[in-house]
Structures are given as structure tokens and as C-alpha cells.
Amino acid sequence: MAGKEIQTPDQAEAFVAKVFDVLDSYDYTRFGEVLSTDLKYEGGLQKTSGLDNFINDIKASTQRMPGLQTSHSRYRTELTAEGTIYSEGHSNASLESNPGKVVTVPMIGVFKLDSEDGKIKEMRIYKDRLPFLALHQALPGMKANN
């Protein structure tokens, strides 16, 4: 489903589910299915413009955190009359090197769609990044901040 076809909250939820399925796959060849080439992204400490720059930033992050696995769950998705999607849920992250440790934080996603191709043109993700610091410090060779 292209974003420009979204007219109901159920359609918005299905679209957001696909977005997180694509992002959590870390299959960068699929990112263009849901993200516009002129994407503007802001989340955590990251702010970037352009799909290629967004992908390069994600690649750099995953290189610093090998074996990173993420998933996202949603408990509420809202669609405004202007077509902006608000999604509330949780972001989960774990590392292959520490499979028993999963960090879960509340998250809000804001997605503005391109009226031409229905892909996400602006994406903002709000979540507390601090709990992920402990996960990062659990990586081999990293020093815990005691």
C-alpha cells in the first residue's frame, strides 16, 4: 500500500507496520519502498537529509553495534486530516553478543508523506536514547560507565 492511498487509521497502521518491518530488516535495498529519496529524518542524536545519507548513517551505527537487532511495536496509530501519521509504541533493541538483554523504551513516530509517491518525506522518532547506552557499553571491548 502506497502512503497516498491512506485514508483510515487501519490503513495508517498497516503502512507503519510495513515501515518498521522494512527498517528493522536492515535490508537497505528495501528502504526506498517506504522512504522518499529526499527524506528528512530526525531522531535521537541523528538528523539527516536524503535517503542515501540516512542509509549511510544507519550503516555507521550498525557497524559500531555489530549484531544489533531491533523491533518496534505499536499500540496506537493516528492519522490527521492532512495525512500526517502519529504512531505510539515501543522500540526494542538487543545485540547478538548479549541475547538475554533487551532494551525497551517508549517511542513516538511522526511520519509526513509525499503527496506524489506516498512515501515518507519527513520522519521524526522520539525516544529516550539513554537506556541504549548500557546496551552499547555491553559490547565487547567497550568500557561500562561506572
Curated annotation (Swiss-Prot):
Keywords: Antibiotic biosynthesis. It comes from Sordaria araneosa (Pleurage araneosa). This is Sordarin/hypoxysordarin biosynthesis cluster protein G. The keyword Glycosyltransferase does not apply. The gene is sdnG. Part of the gene cluster that mediates the biosynthesis of sordarin and hypoxysordarin, glycoside antibiotics with a unique tetracyclic diterpene aglycone structure. First, the geranylgeranyl diphosphate synthase sdnC constructs GGDP from farnesyl diphosphate and isopentenyl diphosphate. The diterpene cyclase sdnA then catalyzes the cyclization of GGDP to afford cycloaraneosene. Cycloaraneosene is then hydroxylated four times by the putative cytochrome P450 monooxygenases sdnB, sdnE, sdnF and sdnH to give a hydroxylated cycloaraneosene derivative such as cycloaraneosene-8,9,13,19-tetraol. The keyword Coiled coil does not apply. Pathway: Antibiotic biosynthesis. Gene3D superfamilies: 3.10.450.50. GO terms for biological process: antibiotic biosynthetic process. Signal peptide: none annotated. InterPro entries: NTF2-like_dom_sf, SnoaL-like. It comes from the Eukaryota.
